[in-house]
Amino acid sequence: MGNRGFLGEKSSENILDVAFSHPIKMIVNALGVPPLRMLELAKEKNVTCGALVGTTQQALKQAESGVDIIISSGTEAGGQCGEISTMVLVPEVVEALKDYDHVSILAAGGIVTGRQMAAAMAMGANGVWTGSVWLTTEEADTAPSIKTKLITTGSNQTVRTRSRTGKFSRQIKSPWTDAWEQDTAPEPLQMPLQSLVSEPALGRIGKLAAVSYTH
């Protein structure tokens, strides 16, 4: 890890070395084409390499880089997300990559139920990629109060905001996100600088939420 938790080139390579020293089956990259070293190690060790994308242009770049799986992630996704809905993005990516026979396509973004999985495959995806739903499982180490929040929050109670990382991410609406939406609020900093502002405060909020603190 670099200063304040950000990754430099050398520390990133060290983390890749650690990851590939274990018997992993798959490794996934986001926010750009995977580093060449990641692609080389994946091929050498027969590890499936995936990439998250939010546009057809990104999907084409990733396919040309040599990844095995494209995860087509719509704006409904929790955490970092793009601007295009899953329903629109998945068939666009499927069409754009029709000549890349070696690449499998997974749909992501707001997918939880079997019906949603079936719908994704009806649009041409080979399967789905799910994330937030696993935070609510018995095996997850998510704090009980956070699990309850995730389960009871309605689909109309999330917002797409830059207030945490500087890039748009989907979060549960909260006083924190409300404050950043005020006319008097400053513009969030670009990634990764916004995390220097947000993480100390959100870290404390998370610890208090874990013990069901209310004020």
Regions found by a protein language model. Name each.
Residues G8, T214-H215:
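Intrinsically disordered, low-complexity regions enriched in small/polar residues
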